[in-house]
Amino acid sequence: VSVSAFIGRVDGTQSIRPIGASNDADGTFFGATAELAFAGFRLGGSVVRDHSSADTSRVLFDGSEATSHYRLRGTTVDVHAGYGFAIGGGWDIGPEVGVTYVSVKRGDAAETGAGAFNLTVAKDRLSYTFLTADLALQMSEGKLRPWLSAGLRQRIDNDRVEATASLTGVSASFTVAGVQRDRSFGNAGAGVAWQASPGLTLFARGNSEFGSDNNAQSVDAGLRFRF
């Protein structure tokens, strides 16, 4: 059994093609993990807190661009299980399944750049639960351990995304449906971990999600302390 704590920096982007919008976020994350490995089986779980800020831009009907800046606070809880088949040279490959719960609190935001069409958007909270099935290739021996994974992710809940906003200079507000995450989408990731000492590991990883209406990419790096 291995228990560890970690801290690092994250940078992510999201594009929403149907409405010509994009999100760019960066910040600090920290959390803890627990892992159990035996006879090729891997069981694990993690809890992550994310303190980030984001910038959103959207293109209006007349070609002008509205931008806004706001705060993001997130919590992610993940449980996963997998099995690795040894293929030689310290590498193993095998399936991995998991359940991930994500809760995000978005701060309020005031747009600029669109004149009378600028929006002031109220803060909100939303959550998702996902099922994930991946095929993972990883180095299981040595101090330097790269890995690759690819698979599918399925959203299993129906938390409706809504946004409440008002136009500049208008006191009345309105609520509209927001952009919902795709129910099913592809997921690919890669990373590397380097064991600098028995209790300290440096890691870096990247992840991409590919859906029918929105795509997302993220890169993070940090330190993991093993107890």
Summary of predicted features, one role per range:
Residues 79, 97, 131-135:
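Internal, well-ordered alpha-helical scaffold/interface segments
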Residues 1-93, 203-226:
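Outer membrane beta-barrel translocator domains of Type V secretion systems
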Residues 37-39, 88, 115, 138-142:
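Short strand-coil-strand connectors
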Residues 3, 7, 120-227:
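Outer membrane beta-barrel transmembrane domains
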Residues 84-86, 91, 104, 146, ...:
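Hydrophobic/basic alpha-helical segments enriched in Actinobacteria
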Residues 96-102:
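Internal active-site segments that recognize and position negatively charged phosphoryl groups
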Residues 13-24, 52-71, 103-127, 156-184:
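Solvent-exposed, glycine/polar-rich loop segments of beta-barrel outer-membrane systems
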